[in-house]
Every structure is written in structure tokens, then in C-alpha cells.
Amino acid sequence: MSQGDDDKIPENVLLASLDDMINWGRANSLWPMFFGLSCCFVEMMTSFTSRYDVSRFGAEVLRGTPRESDLMVIAGTVFKKMAPSILRLYDQMAEPKWVISMGSCANSGGMYDVYSVVQGVNQILPVDLYIPGCPPRPESFLEGLMLLQQKIRSEERPTRPVLRMQGGTQGTVAPILVDGATKSRDTRGPGMEGIAIRGSAMQPPYFAAPRSDELWRPKQPRLPYPDFNLQAELQGAFAGQVVLDETACDMLTYRAPARLVPELLRHLKERKESPFRRLEDIACVDESCRRDREKYKDFTVNYHLTCFDTPGRIRIKTELEGSYPEAPSITSVFPVANWYEREAYDMFGIRFAGHPNLRRILMPPDWDGHPLRKEHPARATELPPYTAEDARRQKALPAGDFFDRVDDETLILNLGPQHPGTHGVIRFVLKLSGEEIVDMDSDIGYHHRAAEKTGERQNWHQYIPYTDRVDYLSGVQNNLAYLNSVETLCGIEIPDRAIYIRVMLCELFRIANHLVWLGTFASDLGAMTPVFYTFTDREKIFDIVEFITGGRMHPAWFRIGGVAEDLPEGWQEKVHSFLEWFPGRLAEYEKLLSGNPIFVARLKGVSAITVDTALEWGITGPNLRACDFAWDLRKKMPYGGYDRFEFEVATAQGGDCYARYQVRMEEMRQSLSIVRQAAAGMPGGRFISPDYRYTLPQKRDALEDIESLIHHFVNSTRGISPPKGECYAPIEGSKGEYGYFAVSDGLHTAYRMRIRTATFPHIQSLPVLSRGWLVSDFLAILGSLDFVLSDLDR
């Protein structure tokens, strides 16, 4: 058509190039895969709900398989154990295809320069677009989607490839980058190569003569704890070989030789009065870098047990010698010890004689070394660059190797490590007879990002943001779990106002966690409606959280000794508005689901367990209370000021999937009551402790008082130095009991930071919960536990 003929074109005719037409269709009809790695995926999924409504951009239909998808959003941390699966998914996607890297961890490794994390997905995949943030907000994801659409429309020339001709461009054309060659090897950015990274007593570079020892500080305060009338009893039963550790300050502690540990634990478990019925954790410590090395053997193994009749805990310590020592397994006493012993073997190289299947649990089967030993590198940048070739060479354990080979005509079914029903990266291997589950096992560690090793590298204040990302659906509860141990170790008194602020925010996050659980759990069972409403209510909570803290999922707002800042003006109105809004919504959810015969039939009687079984397998929190066992740390062993609030412990009968649902519904109601009490009774005064040996001073104090200014400078640069000692003081988290075993050698970083999470034993218990039920029941059983993979793998 010649120029000047435009006026001859009818109004209902549009002229465009074939490139433009193809790009228009593709840009406005993207097919993202249902695929998520970490925290960023939650914010990505939030963009699909009603407040943000991604359907406006033609990308709302998530595809369950890679063969139906053309957009992969790498939402979260890229783990080395997961990298081979990511590559396989990408290779199976339809052409043309595009990749969005969402969040700092996917972009560059972010704050996780750790041995288990790939320092940017661009080392194994080509990337079209990077979205910054940790995690990015839903609005950021929507902007990234629009920018990708713009890129497709303006930069691609797909006609020739579509017509099977040479030339043209479509899909991702960016190169895969090589760490240290085409991208910076240093996480601090270009130009930093050769400049030493600050270290600690355990990690290079070493600093001579730490000044921490020149500062006077009191010893770790001794807490009042029950002695359970054990000393004479153990003296008689073990002929003086079990010795009271009089240096322990946080709980009753005894030392015993390794050979006696199984017998000792059985004695404690089966005693008539005040038995210790549950093993909480096994926490190992590599003692090779202690400053007073002569006082320690090579390794210490700590067994934490709980008594319910007389609420309290006991720690049993045993010392081991040698580079790769051995201790007797206690799986015959406490079945839950199975995974804890495997973890100790995986991370420390400690063997357990008599263990039924001692193999790695978090790291890939071919991993070299044991990451929590002091000599193992902490940083990814201390290891050789990770490439796509490394990922392709790495092989997962074959499904058939999880069970004894028996010719019984059973079927092995892989579920994961990428499946919409697992809500993250985990692999379940089911052994089926027809559709009945006769056995199962779990392959975990796909979300392991070295949270414990990082605790030995960051100073005590710097570590707070890392705690946010352990149970990334529970926000500031993570901070409180960590600070409860650190503040107990230091003997810090928390101001009343800070106590109330903490409790109010923790209970808001408990509701937020349960809302995500409720919506996704109902969705797993086929009820699509609730998730869109529960996320709307969660956004109302996040409006409050963001107004007070400035953050959403990861506020990192609690501080040692209090909180980061005082409450802003106007907080009461926002909290009151939610308190008025939510009870009616909760009643609607209950009416919608509890009155739904299909929902009830899918859950009632399914996966029922007794209290004894729950305690044997270390089950805590709502899943334990669903067995009609009223154990809640906020009531039974109060911490953080919870003894100032009136609330009921939510329980249910039956121990089945439906009872777990009932407990969480009632917990939201009780949390609402606690928030109401905290808001109404909010005291005045300071928001952080004036004990500036351990806290960051309020700004006004640092500006007016030279002593406070000095403390601010020291504590914000080098970091605080708690007294030598150790403390384990768990909290009642959203998913169950959650605590940090903090070990201090008197320096500005923790010597050992062990994290006990609720999800770890809960997922271990799945074979007990699932045997005899159908494949169709499995996702209901799994979802009823309320788990998150970062909580599992740490």
C-alpha cells in the first residue's frame, strides 16, 4: 500500500505486522507454571488474589505441568539440591519460554551467601527479567509481569521461527552467566574482589585478641527450674555415672557417658512420677574452636526432653571424642530421634550405632563434608562456582532405594520435589497397594539455606532478619523465638510496653499464618472459594504490620531488649478496625466449611492418632492439641508476658484431620481476644530495655548521653557479647513449639545456633499418619499438619 492510501482503509480493519500480532497474543496470554521455591512465592501468589488481581494482565492461569507452561517465575532461593529439578522443569517447558527471577535470593543469592545456595539463578538458567526485593511486594511482581510483556512486544521477532524459517527471535535469549567470569564472584558487588570479608573466631579471617574479654559482664543468670527429685534417683539407678551439671542455668542438666544415654533416657521416659514423655531435640556442638579448648571433648550431644506432669525440661549431655565419633542410637526409646540422628550424621559426621537407616537427610547424597563442622566453609563464595553442568551431574536418590526391595506387586509413586499440593520443594515417595498407602518416606533438604551456620557468622543483632525467614509465614514470631533464648541468656528485663507490643504483633501473625493455612488447605481439598477471602483478611493484617513496622512478611522489627521503634500514631484505629471486622469473617469461614458435607467427609476420622503416638513422634502445637491434650507453652510455661493475658487453650477430640482444623479455627478466635487485650491495655513507657550492654539505645538517648552513644557505636558495629553459656527457651509458634538453642563463648557471634522447629518432627511422622489411607487422602493429611519448607529444612 502506498503512502496516502490510509484514508481508503475501512474503520473496522487494523493493519499490523505478523510479528506484532504474534507478540500481542503471547504477551497477553502468558502461562506461568505453578512453581515456587521460597518466601517470594507467597507474595507472588498474593498477586493472584482479589486485592491485586493478576488476571487483569492475562497471566492468571497457573499450569500444573511444565509442558503446559511458557513462563517460569523463579520465586525465591535457588538451592543446590533443587537446581537439577529446576533445570529439568525448564527443559520440559514449551517453546518459546521466558524466565523471571523474583527476589534477591533468586537474583544473586541475596543475604544467603551460604554453601547450599546457588548465587543467582542466572548461573543455571537464562533470565529475561529481575525483580528486586526480599521478598518483592505483589505490586512489584505485577510490574515485572508488565515489563516482560513490554519486552515481548517490543524486542521479539517471532514470525520466522513460527513459519519454520531461519532467523528471528523469540523467548529468552539472555546468556547463562558464569560466576567469577561474566558475573561478580563477590556478593558485595564488583570492585570488592581481594578485600577480606570480616570473620569471627570460627570463620576466617581471624581477628586477634578480641576486646570482648576486656569488658566486664555478669555471668549468665540462673533460672528457677524444677529438679523433679531426680538426683538421688539417678544416683541409685546409675551408680554415680550420671552427674548433675551445676553450671547449667536455663534448665536441669545432667552429664552421662554415651553408652548410658539410651538406658538413661528410657528411665526418664518411663519413671512413674513426672515422666519425660517427649524428646524435643538433639542438638550437637562441634567444640573444636572453643577458646578454652582444654575443657571440652571434640563434640557434645545435647538431648532435650519435656515433662508434662510437672511442666519443665531436662537436658542430657554426652561428650564424644574423635574426628568421626560414634554414639548409640536412641531410636528404640524415642522413634522421633530417627531424623535428629540422621541430621547429626549429615551435618557433623557423628555416627549412631543401631540406627535403622543412617544416611544424609538435608544435603545431597554426594555432598562432600559435613556443613556444621567448624572447618566446613560457610559461604558459597568460598566454594567452587556452581554451574548448570554441576546441576546436571547431580542425581537424586532413586525412589526404589527408599524401601526394601520386595516382589509384592506394590507401586512406587514419586510426589515432588515440585508438586502444587506440597506447597514448596519437598519429595514424598509413596509405596502403594492399589491406591492404599502401605508405606512412605520423605526426601527433604530442598529448602536448606544454612540458617544455623549463618547464626555462627552474623553477630547477635545481625542475625534477627535471618530468623524471619525460618517460618516465613509467622513474621515476628520468629524474632521472639530467637530473642527469648538470647534475652534469657543475657538476663535482660523487657519493658512492659515492649512486652505488649510483641504479644499483639505475634498474635496478629498467628492469625495471618492460620489464614494462609485455611485458604490453601481448603483449596487442596477442592474448595477454591476460601483462599481468595482468607488472603484478603491477611492483607488487612499486613496493613497493620506495615503501618507499625514498615515491613510485610519479614518485618525483622523485634530487637534484643524490646522493639525497633515505638508504635506510630494512629495504630489503635487500624487494630480496632480489624478487631471489628474479623469475627464476622471467621464465623462465615466456619459456616462455609464446617457445614460442607464434602469438606467434613474428607477430614473426619482420617489420620487419627492418640496422644501417646503424638508424643512419641514429637508432635507439638495445634496438631498435639487436636488429640485433646491441652499443652500450650503460653499457658503451661509462660514466656514473653503471656501470663498477663486471659485466653483458653484450644483443643479438639479425635486427633484426626478435622480436629486439627477445629483447633486452628478456635486459635484464631483466642488470638483475636489476646490482640484486643493487648491493644486495650497497652502501657506507656520505654519500648526497649535501658540495659545498653546488650541493646541498641533509643536514638534520643544516644543523642543526649555520651555513655549511650558509646554503647550504640559498639553494639551496632562489633555487636554485643553475651556471657558464656547456653540457653534453650522455646515459644508456642503458629505451627508448634519453636526454639533456638543459643550457645555463647562470650563473643559477638554465637558459637552454635541450633534451631528446633515444629515442622521437622511433624513431617517425620507422616508414615504413621498416612499408612492405610488412600492417595487421595494424602494431601488432606499433609495439609492438616500446617507446614512450611523453610521451617523444615532451615
Swiss-Prot record:
It is a peripheral membrane protein. InterPro entries: NADH_DH_suC, NADH_Q_OxRdtase_suD, NADH_quin_OxRdtase_su_C/D-like, NADH_UbQ_OxRdtase-like_20kDa, NADH_UbQ_OxRdtase_30kDa_su, NADH_UbQ_OxRdtase_49kDa_CS, NADH_UbQ_OxRdtase_CS, NADH_UQ_OxRdtase_20Kd_su. Keywords: Cell inner membrane, Cell membrane, Membrane, Multifunctional enzyme, NAD, Quinone, Translocase, Transport, Ubiquinone. Residues 1-158 are annotated as: NADH dehydrogenase I subunit B. Residues 414-794 are annotated as: NADH dehydrogenase I subunit D. The keyword Cell inner membrane applies. It is found in: Cell inner membrane. One of its GO terms (cellular component) is plasma membrane. Residues 232-387 are annotated as: NADH dehydrogenase I subunit C. NDH-1 shuttles electrons from NADH, via FMN and iron-sulfur (Fe-S) centers, to quinones in the respiratory chain. The immediate electron acceptor for the enzyme in this species is believed to be ubiquinone. Couples the redox reaction to proton translocation (for every two electrons transferred, four hydrogen ions are translocated across the cytoplasmic membrane), and thus conserves the redox energy in a proton gradient. NDH-1 is composed of about 13 different subunits. Subunits NuoBCD, E, F, and G constitute the peripheral sector of the complex. This is NADH-quinone oxidoreductase subunit B/C/D. The lineage of its organism: Bacteria, Pseudomonadati, Thermodesulfobacteriota, Desulfuromonadia, Geobacterales. The gene is nuoBCD.
